[in-house]
Every structure is written in C-alpha cells, then in structure tokens.
Amino acid sequence: MRKSVFITGGSRGIGAACVELFSKNGFSVAFAYGSDDKAAQKLAAKTSALAIKADVSDAKQIEKAFDQARTYFGIPIFDVVVCNAGISASGLITDMSDEDVDNLIGINLVGTINVSRKAVAHMVEAKKGSIVMISSMWGLRAASCESVYAATKAGIIGFARSLAAELGPSGIRVNVVSPGVIATDMNSEYSEADISALAEETPLGRIGLPEEVAEAVYYLASDKASFINGQVLGVDGGFAV
C-alpha cells in the first residue's frame, strides 16, 4: 500500500518542494494552501496531488481538510504530516501592528498546533506516524527586527519536543527542520544587498534551496530516521552554529 503525506503551505516554496519530492517517491500527497489557487492547481496537476484550500489557523477548516483528504485516498490516517505553513513579517516591535502579531502567531504557531492535533487523533489509534514541523534558524538564534516571528518559530520547537515525548510511547515521531535563508517568496522582502549579506554570513557562502530543505523533511519522515525523535535538524549552511 502506498504511503501518504499531508503537507500544509504546499503551493509554493519549501512546501511545494516537499509536494514534488514525496510525490516523486510514490506517496499519495495531499496539500493545504492558503490563497494561491493558480499555483496550487498547477502543482496538483504536475504531481497528481490533492490540493485543498484551508486556513491552518482555523481548526475546523483543518479538520475538514483532513477528512476530505482521507476520504479521497480511502485511508484511515496519513503516514506523514508536514507542518510547513507559515508567514513572515519583520520590523521593530514598536512598528508591529496587532494584525501582524495575530497573523504571525495564528498561522505559524497556532496553525502548527491545529494541524498536529487533527493528525494525532488518528495516528494514536494506529500506533504509528511521523510529524515534521518547519521552524527557522531565527527560532534558535537572536535577530533584531525578527522578535515576533522568532517567537513563533521557537514556540514550534518547544511544542515539537514536548509532543515527541508525549507521543513516542504511541509509536509517533515528531521532529523539526530549521531552515536558514532559503530562496523562496517569503524572503522576497529582503533586498538584494540583505540577501548577499546573509549569504556572506553563512559559512557555506550561499543561501539554500527549497529542494534542500525538502530532502531533510523527507529524511526525517522516512524509515531511515526511525529512531530519531524530538530533534531539530538545521538546514542553514552553518548559519546558526
């Protein structure tokens, strides 16, 4: 029987790279996306994945998305869940609006919790499963003008580690991938000069690719990582060392 994966934030960037990689490796793939219908449908057609529009900050929408995807594939659970959906907003804390704060926490942290809760309900019954969450190097390292974003990403790491301890006895593994500066739309707010400076600050001397992060996600989700639980795997070229 084919293995299955549910990926959030799947229409672009790291999420899209994950959709393509898991599909290439024979998985039945469902992915949730927030707004870009055109990109989602194009990716779904390319990979034969199921695209579902859903707001991860809304637990009811996520529950409905899981039910729709499980029914579509005729499966009781997903073998792998990738919590990738996220947004960024940088600036001085005094310049962050209430909406900025609510959106960052709602999508990045609450969204990850919502997706995990809905996935775990079925995984516990089956006594198996793997959850991979996407954090950030800013969840591990201090950065000016990234305070709220960093708080959400650090929160993901704390949540994942505690969840790994909680779910380990049920045969469910929970791990985190912590990307550095990656060539995605999310980093388009940075100027070319900023990107160049970040690349120079990275020991490997460049920024990363979405496909490189996807490979790390796939590894942690695979049987090759069967004894890895509660860990944070940095894919940052050594930036956070």
Task: Describe every region a protein language model picked out.
Residues S11-R12:
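Conserved glycine-rich cofactor-binding loop
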Residues L92-I93, S97-I105, N187, D194, ...:
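Substrate-binding pocket helix/loop in short-chain dehydrogenase/reductase
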Residues A121, A165-P169, S226:
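Alpha-helical segment proximal to the catalytic Tyr-Lys
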Residues S136:
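Residue(s) in the substrate-gating loop at a strand-loop-helix junction
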